[in-house]
From Swiss-Prot:
<dbReference type="GO" id="GO:0009718">
    <property type="term" value="P:anthocyanin-containing compound biosynthetic process"/>
</dbReference>
<feature type="binding site">
    <location>
        <position position="243"/>
    </location>
    <ligand>
        <name>UDP-alpha-D-glucose</name>
    </ligand>
</feature>
<protein>
    <recommendedName>
        <fullName>Anthocyanidin 3-O-glucosyltransferase 2</fullName>
        <ecNumber>2.4.1.115</ecNumber>
    </recommendedName>
</protein>
<feature type="binding site">
    <location>
        <position position="263"/>
    </location>
    <ligand>
        <name>UDP-alpha-D-glucose</name>
    </ligand>
</feature>
<feature type="binding site">
    <location>
        <position position="221"/>
    </location>
    <ligand>
        <name>UDP-alpha-D-glucose</name>
    </ligand>
</feature>
<dbReference type="InterPro" id="IPR035595">
    <property type="entry name" value="UDP_glycos_trans_CS"/>
</dbReference>
<comment type="function">
    <text>In the presence of other necessary color factors, this glycosylation reaction allows the accumulation of anthocyanin pigments.</text>
</comment>
<feature type="binding site">
    <location>
        <position position="261"/>
    </location>
    <ligand>
        <name>an anthocyanidin</name>
    </ligand>
</feature>
<feature type="binding site">
    <location>
        <position position="241"/>
    </location>
    <ligand>
        <name>UDP-alpha-D-glucose</name>
    </ligand>
</feature>
<comment type="pathway">
    <text>Pigment biosynthesis; anthocyanin biosynthesis.</text>
</comment>
<keyword id="KW-0328">Glycosyltransferase</keyword>
<comment type="similarity">
    <text>Belongs to the UDP-glycosyltransferase family.</text>
</comment>
<feature type="binding site">
    <location>
        <position position="262"/>
    </location>
    <ligand>
        <name>UDP-alpha-D-glucose</name>
    </ligand>
</feature>
<dbReference type="InterPro" id="IPR002213">
    <property type="entry name" value="UDP_glucos_trans"/>
</dbReference>
<dbReference type="GO" id="GO:0047213">
    <property type="term" value="F:anthocyanidin 3-O-glucosyltransferase activity"/>
</dbReference>
<dbReference type="Pfam" id="PF00201">
    <property type="entry name" value="UDPGT"/>
</dbReference>
<feature type="binding site">
    <location>
        <position position="238"/>
    </location>
    <ligand>
        <name>UDP-alpha-D-glucose</name>
    </ligand>
</feature>
């Protein structure tokens, strides 16, 4: 979002590099959409409910326009994305928070500007035991791999009707759960969600009492500390890119429930492109007001926790690859060295 600074750098003859905090697949998608807009006047808003599929160079599989990311379905935001993508093409290089073993197709699809994959860049040190001891103690008391963790990011929240559907799904699934719920800000206010004073106000009557032996409802969650805990066996997530990388780093399979920004694309990549996730609703958009019913959520939770042995194996393998990428001689270690060499040589 600081691409205008590139103009200032040009005035002083300083080469510009972009750091891209999302994945390489979405970077390729951004550049592709900008290209077909300029060449064919592509307007994503016209295709959001169609069965059209896009052949995106950074993906192996066709991308359905019905799950276009929320970030490009607003006219003003789409214009901003186009301007940013054009600036990206002028950079001397793009540094991306990903690694070759995860997004090889996307990384290898880039020619100009060069892409440097230096991830996963994560802060995996957490003091969850000091800041949220009651959560960590509860997890300590659960069997290994038995808990599904539901958390939707710093901006993630649902309506009361949707919370009730999630509650019914969890109760009917019978699985142990740790569920972070947040109160949405008022409709006329741009703000982060807050914690509920009493979750009983928005959950089905008697839900907390009926599930007290298997579940815990919390407010804000120390996500890294929770994902690192051996009791966690699955993660229901909004698919923010950091959350995706964290789930892989700790080897926790993910069920995808995207909400905003580029998260629909991330969900597609995890479920269809990479086979590392389970779908709840890849096309869900928070602004749509659609309620995902409890049956659909329950099926996904059961699939995640009961029938995902192959995916679980793949996620565990990716966990090891994510760590290997960063060590001396690893793919991201080498790519970072290439970036440093290029930057130093000007």
């Amino acid at each position: 979002f600081c691409t205008p600074m590139m103009d200032l750098a040009d005035e002083f003859g300083i080469p510009s590099y972009i750091f891209f905090a999302s994945g390489g697949g979405f970077l390729g998608f951004m550049l592709y959409v900008q290209k077909i807009h300029d060449e064919e006047n592509f307007n994503p808003i016209e295709f959001k409910d169609s069965d059209t599929e896009l052949i995106v160079p950074s993906l192996v599989n066709p991308f359905p326009t019905r799950i276009l990311p929320s970030s490009i379905l607003n006219k003003e935001r789409f214009g901003q994305l186009l301007a940013i993508a054009k600036k990206f093409r002028q950079a001397k290089g793009i540094i991306v928070n990903t690694f070759l073993e995860l997004e090889s197709r996307a990384i290898e699809s880039f020619k100009v500007p060069p892409l440097y994959h230096v991830g996963p860049i994560l802060d995996v040190k957490s003091d969850g035991r000091n800041t949220h001891p009651e959560i960590m103690q509860w997890l300590d008391d659960q069997p290994e791999g038995s808990v599904v963790f539901l958390c939707f990011g710093s901006m993630g929240s649902f309506s009361e009707d949707q919370l009730k559907e999630i509650a019914y799904a969890l109760e009917n699934s019978g699985h142990r759960f740790l569920w972070s719920i947040r109160r949405p800000p008022p409709p006329d206010k741009i703000a982060s969600p807050t914690d509920y004073e009493d979750p009983r106000d928005v959950l089905p009557e008697g839900f907390l009492e009926r599930t007290v032996a298997v579940g815990k409802v919390i407010g804000w969650a120390p996500q890294v500390a929770v994902l690192a805990h051996p009791a966690i066996g699955g993660f229901v997530s909004h698919c923010g890119w950091n959350s995706v990388l964290e789930s892989l780093w700790f080897g926790v399979p993910i069920a995808t429930w995207p909400m905003y920004a580029e998260q629909q694309f991330n969900a597609f990549e995890m479920v269809v492109e990479l086979g590392l996730g389970v779908e709840i609703d890849m096309g869900y958009r928070k602004e749509s007001g659609i309620i995902v019913n409890s049956d659909k959520i329950e099926r996904a939770i059961r699939k995640l926790m009961e029938n995902s042995d192959e995916k679980r194996k793949k996620v565990k393998e990716m966990r090891e690859k994510s760590k290997m990428a960063l060590i001396d001689g690893g793919s991201s270690f080498i790519s970072l060295g290439d970036f440093i060499k290029d930057a130093m040589e000007g």
